[in-house]
């Protein structure tokens, strides 16, 4: 047999075997996926959490600005937390997420560790640290506790050909998937493109039926202070990661300024 024909036959065999291997692996993965047990459904929230306290008593956690000082065309970036008082929606959502994580950490339900990572050279906002999250059991059914539970499952599950099942979730993934669950829970009629606005709306709807006690403010502030006292670098990494995740999600959302609105 001429060398050229032998080479063609050889490569045909290699390609055929490669296609067969991919088909077998794909078939096995499909069978596993079809026969995998359904994940238990996470019940709806039924108790207040730190995020509810921050939203309900926002003036005690964030600086407010008089409504009259903000031009009407810029007010879409703000949330009215009291009569004539506004806070930036992104800052409010950031504090709600941070307070919820601090409360769950104080209760021993979440643990964190910070690891170094290479920042993205093409992203000026990219971080050089990564926060990994461990969760031992389902979190309390607060609005964010429920969404964190769903987000943790998604962030740690195996992805075919990409990764095995994880024992820890990357905080960026956890927050992103939790905010996706917030949007899904709101439904397409109520959900907006802005993830921070969706979170505020989601918790505000819960607060319409369940009000946190006024004494809860001290508990939430105590959890935040305890986290900073335990490890200030960790607290800063948590806040920076939450801020970066909200920023990254906002890049995917249309900006009213860019649209001329």
List where the protein language model places each region.
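Feature marks short, highly hydrophobic, charge-poor N-terminal signal-anchor/signal peptide-like helices
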Residues: 1-15
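Core hydrophobic alpha-helical transmembrane segments of single-pass membrane proteins
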Residues: 13-23
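Short, amphipathic alpha-helical interface elements at domain boundaries
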Residues: 23-199, 254-257
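Short hydrophobic helical membrane-anchoring segments positioned at the boundary
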Residues: 177, 181-261
